[in-house]
Amino acid sequence: MIDQYKHQQLRIGSVSPQQISTWANKILPNGERVGEVTKPYTFHYKTNKPEKDGLFCERIFGPIKSGICACGNYRVIGDKKKDRKSCEQCGVEFVDSRIRRYQMGYIKLACPVTHVWYLKRLPSYIANLLDKPLKELEGLVYCDFSFARPIAKKPTFLRLRGLFEYEIQSWKYSIPLFFTTQGFDTFRNREISTGAGAIREQLADLDLRIIIDSSLVEWKELGEDGPTGNEWEDRKVGRRKDFLVRRMELAKHFIRTNIDPKWMVLCLLPVLPPELRPIVQIDGGKLMSSDINELYRRVIYRNNTLTDLLTTSRSTPGELIMCQEKLVQEAVDTLLDNGIRGQPMRDGHNKVYKSFSDVIEGKEGRFRETLLGKRVDYSGRSVIVVGPSLSLYQCGLPREIAIELFQTFVIRSLIRQQLASNIGVAKSKIREKKPIVWEILREVMRGHPVLLNRAPTLHRLGIQAFQPVLVEGRAICLHPLVRKGFNADFDGDQMAVHVPLSFEAQAEARLLMFSHINLLSPAIGDPISVPTQDMLIGLYVLTSGNRRGICVNRYNPSNHRNQNKRIYENNYKYTKEKEPFFCNSYDAIGAYRQKRINLDSPLWLRWRLDQRVIAAREAPLEVHYESLGTYYDIYGQYLIVRSIKKEILSIYIRTTVGHISIYREIEEAIQGFCQAC
């Protein structure tokens, strides 16, 4: 629907029988009104054509083929005349066959039927409005109560019967026999109110504004009383107050939306358009039909049986009529929501029928799968894994996914570079996975961003743009720092990849959606690309080092009680052989790769002659003299090599390969930032 502000919207709610009739009914040029489905048939087994007035009737729902009626006559559609032409013999209009996607029909129910969503769903709207227990209403709807309190205010037999303190037991056996008498209809109309008709009468007598006023007065009275001191009574009062609030809100909703409560009881049952419940022919000539067709057939069968009982035979026992009304109610319940009353209905293969509720709800329902989310071209999906070698703005695409996503671009490049004469030759080269294909694919990907999306997309960081690179394997590689924006984990999460096709979409991806641009949370402004979990553990391992340093072991006051032999052993552990010296960081990392030292092994790294390394008043822990006159001033974390004239020849700092690695990463990042500025 389109509101007054020209906004397209979809609203689900109750509708009047007149509205249902308006949707389904149409008047043919000969004056005949069609729209009611009266037969439970689909297609004729000989002619393979839809049955007249059946669930696929062409007069009601429109022609199967555009411009062709059931007789086989053809007319050009699109005539500008106001009156749509139809066949004089079969009554089928000459219109587009797409009308079968939205043209509805209806079933005229022989008895009122309660909508199971409003009765059985919690909270029960009908029970809330009538202020009656749900079990009592269910017994009334499904005819489990033979008698109900009369709706009329005039004195009746049942009202007088309710005044007796004790009930004669023989009544329980004698009254059912009265159902078989000829005067039962008169007695039933006056004394008995049962089934969905009783619910409809009570809902029709409601005044919503009186309900709001009376509920508000009762709520205030309960609030003025205050706590009683009895926990059970206080809880009971609290539940009653909550119920009154829900009842007032429900009544206000009905007033605001201009919905009559009696519309929750159906008199006309809408029939979905045929294209939404198709019958499809598969291999071998077999037919596959939607479960909704079978459920509609069950409703029509039982409704026609009840109609025959009410119209053709006046001597039908009352219990049989009530039983048939119950069957109609159960058939409509199964159509709307199979299994809501307990055991679901199954077919001959013990498979549960898929009702209308099953079709529209859930992840695979009509709304989420077809309307809210759709399958689109140029998209793929795979598991995400960590790509530690990737930049923040890059993502790794497996070869299988990349060649499918960018296949059209690769084909165009192959033809432009005269490496393929036509599309077929280009596709064959792609299937054969020629080396030139991967080179062109890398070139295409170099200038084309992709979008990664992780469902559910709760905020704008749930979908970001990346520069794709080819990776081996079948998983999408992702930089670990962008994990938090997607709220993803590398424990089996899946992400979808989309290719923006238009220039506008590519420009938007580059300027607004790239991951290295979205570094702050759009909600609170805090940094969102921060190291967490495995990255923090890795940084800790890199920078932890070996705690057995000079100060910890040799000059710790708690070790003064150690014997000279132990001190001698400690001195031996920190010689040049145990703590090697390196001229630069490249030599240190090379030694680590050759497995000569460990990641946390202490080492001495030659440093530039920077006086800032030397503390102003720090005294050396040891001084080692060489035979040529040079000597070493050894401090806690560095040492200084001096000449005989006390000139500084070189400085060595005590570090580990882990510290060197993280320092180099930070230095490269700072240099790259300075160049970018």
Curated annotation (Swiss-Prot):
| Cofactors demanded by this protein | Mg(2+); Zn(2+)
User: Under which EC number(s) is this enzyme classified?
Assistant: 2.7.7.6
Identify the Pfam families for this entry: RNA_pol_Rpb1_1 (PF04997), RNA_pol_Rpb1_2 (PF00623)
Instruction: Enumerate the UniProt keywords alphabetically.
Output: Chloroplast, DNA-directed RNA polymerase, Magnesium, Metal-binding, Nucleotidyltransferase, Plastid, Transcription, Transferase, Zinc
By its UniProt entry, which InterPro entries does this protein fall under? DNA-dir_RpoC_beta_prime, RNA_pol_asu, RNA_pol_N, RNA_pol_Rpb1_1, RNA_pol_Rpb1_3_sf, RNA_pol_Rpb1_clamp_domain, RNApol_RpoC1
Member of which family? Belongs to the RNA polymerase beta' chain family. RpoC1 subfamily.
Q: What is this protein called?
A: DNA-directed RNA polymerase subunit beta'
Q: Which organism is it from?
A: Daucus carota (Wild carrot)
Q: What is the lineage of its organism?
A: Eukaryota, Viridiplantae, Streptophyta, Embryophyta, Tracheophyta
The protein's gene is named: rpoC1
